[in-house]
């Protein structure tokens, strides 16, 4: 609808047209400030130009049937859509059902490589991981809905010092809790009940002869064993959020290609040796300083593994590569992009989205940390507490790059203070009316819209605006727009519901048709957010 209006206006006016929503709904459904832009070109007052353009648009053959009114107001041109125009789009939308708002794959479709979560398999997923996980999953859903091809990948950091530290931590826990030895723990190690659980499970699963080997062999085996267990648990945690990856990429396997990558970096004159270390000349490409890739002890840095991984990704020639990282990784962006330039790739294809911190409260007090994980709040604990759908909604309700803090008890309330409940309640009200109505769904769908007032038309317009919201959410990586849209549409519906009788009136079928459109838009919006909308819910407010 928005796209059609924009394209027709641009054809008539032979200029790019920006379409906005008026702040006051009494001014119509759409508005454009184009007169202000043209005023400089034609050296006329925006008010005069707006009047001229409003007349031109309203009388043009291509807009007949589109608008009830086209009015110039303080330099803006305001448009009120006709009921016939709205009904045409309503009928089409209701026929499309779950495909309403979607696009077919076309020449403009993108091939997107989306990497997210990628938490080290050294412990259970905590609530900080959940934000990027939920965002990435919904972004992929929206991208596919819009006709793009998406590969979702989890990069498994299954080698290096962190994995060895995991094995060491399990070995020390084994000695303390299984062998009952006195143990001195290092300053840095993995702690929490999950480490003890792994140690005890290793005692039952692994051959007793292993624990008679030298310590390095034991740590190596326990590192691999614990890593595999944690990865299984991570997959279970993600499954509880409704998240499934197309691919799990092993750093250990990918890093086998390091020699070829380093050879290409050498050819590009990207490396040098200093202080017995190998450095990347990343400062040549907007990085703050050069970065170490190989340390004095000949071990590789985390960045070296990241470079090899990105080389593997870029060899696959996707249109766009999106990484979702924690905000604490912001310093890595410049150095990774520098390596891509040295390797001959277009670094602009890489977009890194940063997920800010999450603060969880319960009754206005900090949420209790998990004993099992030490000083973290586990995803599993929060999902068990409030459910996957509430967690997904609240995590998507603010921009990814802004701090998020919320009280989980708000999401347990059955009143308008709980946004997800209020949206479910709107859909529940609609389905209850449809059940009570003597009319079949087919009768309602075939009913022409002829007698709607301004408020009813605006509710219908809001429900039909979903496609534009979906596109904007994807293009701006602003998935909070979907949450805001669903909340606003639900609120408008509740106002409509409370304003007067819907059943047993002369225009009941018309009003129920609006309700069907609202339900469809709420259902499709929630589906893209990874939430199943409810059709039955009790009200206590």
UniProtKB/Swiss-Prot annotation:
The gene is argS. Monomer. Keywords: Aminoacyl-tRNA synthetase, ATP-binding, Cytoplasm, Ligase, Nucleotide-binding, Protein biosynthesis. One of its GO terms (biological process) is arginyl-tRNA aminoacylation. InterPro entries: aa-tRNA-synth_I_CS, Arg-tRNA-ligase, Arg-tRNA-synth_N, Arg-tRNA-synth_N_sf, ArgRS_core, DALR_anticod-bd, Rossmann-like_a/b/a_fold, tRNAsynth_Ia_anticodon-bd. CDD domains: ArgRS_core. Its main location: cytoplasm. GO terms for molecular function: arginine-tRNA ligase activity; ATP binding. GO terms for cellular component: cytoplasm. This is Arginine--tRNA ligase. SUPFAM superfamilies: Anticodon-binding domain of a subclass of class I aminoacyl-tRNA synthetases, Arginyl-tRNA synthetase (ArgRS), N-terminal 'additional' domain, Nucleotidylyl transferase. It is found in: Cytoplasm. A motif ('HIGH' region) lies at residues 119-129. It catalyses: tRNA(Arg) + L-arginine + ATP = L-arginyl-tRNA(Arg) + AMP + diphosphate. Its EC number is 6.1.1.19. Coiled coil: none annotated. Belongs to the class-I aminoacyl-tRNA synthetase family. It comes from the Bacteria. Pfam families: Arg_tRNA_synt_N, DALR_1, tRNA-synt_1d.
């Amino acid at each position: 609808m928005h796209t059609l209006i924009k394209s027709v206006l641009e054809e008539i006016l032979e200029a790019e047209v920006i379409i906005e929503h008026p702040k006051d709904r009494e001014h119509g459904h759409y508005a454009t400030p184009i007169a202000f832009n043209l005023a400089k070109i034609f050296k006329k007052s925006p008010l005069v130009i707006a009047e001229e353009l409003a007349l031109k648009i309203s009388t043009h053959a291509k807009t007949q049937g589109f608008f009830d009114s086209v009015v110039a107001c303080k330099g803006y041109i305001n448009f009120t859509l006709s009921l016939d125009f709205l009904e045409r789009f309503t009928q089409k939308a209701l026929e499309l059902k779950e495909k309403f708002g979607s696009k077919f794959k076309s020449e403009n479709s993108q091939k997107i490589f989306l990497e997210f979560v990628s938490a080290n398999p050294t412990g259970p997923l905590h609530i900080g991981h959940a934000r990027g996980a939920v965002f990435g999953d919904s972004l992929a859903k929206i991208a596919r809905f819009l006709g793009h091809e998406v590969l979702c990948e989890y990069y498994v950091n299954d080698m290096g010092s962190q994995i060895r530290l995991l094995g060491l931590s399990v070995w020390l826990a084994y000695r303390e809790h299984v062998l009952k030895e006195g143990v001195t723990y290092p300053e840095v190690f993995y702690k929490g009940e999950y480490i003890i659980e792994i140690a005890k499970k290793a005692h039952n699963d692994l051959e007793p002869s292993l624990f008679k080997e030298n310590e390095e062999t034991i740590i190596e085996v326990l590192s691999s064993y614990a890593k595999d267990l944690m990865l299984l648990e991570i997959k279970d945690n993600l499954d509880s959020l409704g998240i499934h990856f197309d691919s799990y990429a092993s750093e250990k396997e990918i890093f086998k290609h390091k020699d070829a990558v380093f050879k290409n970096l050498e050819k590009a004159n990207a490396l040098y040796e200093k202080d017995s270390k190998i450095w990347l000349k990343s400062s040549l490409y907007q990085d703050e300083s050069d970065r170490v890739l190989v340390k004095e002890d000949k071990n590789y840095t985390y960045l070296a593994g990241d470079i090899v991984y990105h080389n593997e990704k870029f060899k696959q020639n996707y249109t766009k590569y999106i990484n979702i990282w924690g905000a604490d990784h912001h310093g890595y962006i410049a150095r990774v992009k520098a390596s891509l330039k040295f390797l001959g790739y277009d670094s602009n294809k890489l977009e890194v989205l940063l997920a800010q911190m999450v603060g969880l409260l319960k009754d206005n007090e900090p949420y209790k940390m998990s004993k099992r994980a030490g000083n973290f709040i586990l995803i599993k604990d929060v999902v068990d507490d409030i459910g996957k759908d509430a967690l997904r909604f609240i995590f998507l309700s603010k921009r990814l790059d802004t701090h998020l803090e919320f009280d989980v008890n708000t999401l347990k309330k059955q009143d308008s203070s709980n946004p997800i409940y209020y949206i479910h309640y709107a859909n529940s009200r609609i389905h209850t009316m449809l059940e009570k109505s003597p009319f079949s769904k087919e009768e309602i769908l075939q009913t022409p819209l002829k007698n709607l007032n301004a408020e009813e038309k605006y509710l219908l317009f809001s429900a039909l605006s979903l496609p534009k919201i979906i596109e904007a959410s994807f293009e701006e990586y602003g998935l909070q727009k979907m949450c805001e849209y669903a909340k606003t549409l639900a609120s408008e519906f509740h106002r409509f519901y409370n304003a007067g009788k819907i059943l047993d009136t002369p225009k009941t079928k018309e009003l129920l048709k609006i309700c069907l459109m609202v339900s469809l838009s709420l259902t499709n919006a929630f589906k893209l957010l990874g939430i199943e909308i409810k059709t039955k819910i009790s009200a206590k407010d």
